Amino acid sequence: MTAPFLSSLSPTSPLASATAPFPGSRKVYARPADAPHLRVPFREIILSDPGEAPVRVADPSGPYSDPEATIDLRQGLARHRASWASARGNSTVTAGRPAPSEGDFEAFPLTYAPLRRRDETPFTQLEYARAGVITDEMIYVATRENLGRDSAVAGACARLAGGEAFGAALPAHVTPEFVRAEIAAGRAIIPANINHPELEPTIIGRNFLVKVNANIGNSALGSSIEDEVAKLVWAIRWGADTVMDLSTGKAIHATREWILRNSPVPIGTVPLYQALEKVGGDATRLDWAVFEDTLIEQCEQGVDYFTIHAGVRLAHIPLTASRTTGIVSRGGSILAKWCLSHHRENFLYERFADICAILRRYDVAFSLGDGLRPGSVADANDAAQFAELDTLGALTAVAWEHGCQVMVEGPGHVPMHKIKANMDRQLATCGEAPFYTLGPLTTDIAPGHDHITSAIGAAMIGWFGTAMLCYVTPKEHLGLPDRADVKAGVIAYKLAAHAADIAKGHPAAQLRDDAISRARFDFRWSDQFNLGLDPEGARAFHDETLPHAAHKTAHFCSMCGPKFCSMKISHDIRDGALEGADALTQAGLDQMSATFRASGGEVHLDAQALDALAWEGKPAR
């Protein structure tokens, strides 16, 4: 089944709008001085005021927003990381396994022999970091975090001092050595499977910019390979730093392969979903052999991180009995059913060391799943949630012992006054491993608007220390998100992450805000649109009432009109004050000159003469 847009990017393709350059922007690349073979992408927003420098922003959209790039989804993206792995010389080619038969769904047309570690020399990013080795990936992400700057941004120390980072240690300038040290300590990860050479690496940790994940994936009730690839490109256009493919419908393997070969961002999955599909959807038939086979299959494809629900233990399940909403995690409910039907401990918990052994062969990172997360504010911070978190802390230590990178997943639904306790407990329990949270949603009354209530909690927990925020779309609890929902969810979460970065005192976070504030005060409407997260959306709103080109230079908008615009009035006040100040200054100079002449023109006066002089009724001294 060949899709038209997979063959070419025609103007009618679902990807046409996702691959156009951003208005008023250009794609730029930085080459680190200590690794000039690397090419790190950014976006620069060009401003209309010649006195304003271009504003550089992070850009996870890969080549899709580069007008110089040729996009061919059937060929996939350039495999630039392949040379990095080859230069290390510690991997070996394996035969791999044939792709499963998935009916008439079209497989990705190209095949590649998978790689895996060759020996016990350092291979994962964590092992390299502990050995004191700075990898290409570490240099790459340091350049990304600095937006390509060779030194700290002006005023960095003041911004750091002005923020409240709750114990985080953001540097004024991110160096590759700082990245290495954070990874070695387990406080950060670079998800980068050796079999995902198309990847543009990113770093996840609380001492770096807060990242955003977008979930995509088909279901038994809808979507297609074409739709999911389009959602991938759409999500990263609006700022998703990683993407999880949570497909549970048909052609899970083929869908994932198309996504991986065309993804410049890390891809995560929940292997349990495909394992369940392999046993016909019957959770009681799951076993280690099926799960192991699924893990290896996805490692060989190039998945960068796995959600593993190994913390759902048999003894924890009764703790959920009194909950308002029970177990709301798909993975958690599947494993709870397995545990109860067999009356055995979770086989993922029992075989966790074996899972570590598999993941370290490919440098796949753990995302330890929160299968017992609260699904309502009534259940927040309960015994079941924290019992699982304690288990995840112990499993984090086990994964580190095996040289595996780890982040830990978190809730969920948590009211605002209980959010910080989640962050504090995770840091203490999990040794400061990066926290990756779904929201949390701060109230349960927002069906259709859960991207808003969850972004409130996301901004707070991001400020408190969460390293990556998993987006929620308006369709949460209601249905499978489409492209419009993906965009709304990503933008809501980019706002939350950015707000957290500013509050933490990130040195460069506020530069974009300051630029848009100056543009707003100067009535540079096009600059305002282009500096925002959604330039097209902002322009469309302005066009609804002021559509003509002349309106883009007007000193008012339709909210206030020309006579009630506060910024226009502020300009008038400022201009008048400056003119008045000049007049007052001249009057004062004239008066003092007259006083000097009245004193006889003497430069030195005795005390009695000074006391005789007065200006505006005040003594002269």
Swiss-Prot record:
Pathway: Cofactor biosynthesis; thiamine diphosphate biosynthesis. Zn(2+) binds at H413, H477. One of its GO terms (molecular function) is carbon-carbon lyase activity. It catalyses: 5-amino-1-(5-phospho-beta-D-ribosyl)imidazole + S-adenosyl-L-methionine = 4-amino-2-methyl-5-(phosphooxymethyl)pyrimidine + CO + 5'-deoxyadenosine + formate + L-methionine + 3 H(+). Its cofactor is [4Fe-4S] cluster. Binds 1 [4Fe-4S] cluster per subunit. The cluster is coordinated with 3 cysteines and an exchangeable S-adenosyl-L-methionine. [4Fe-4S] cluster binds at C557, C560, C565. Belongs to the ThiC family. This is Phosphomethylpyrimidine synthase.
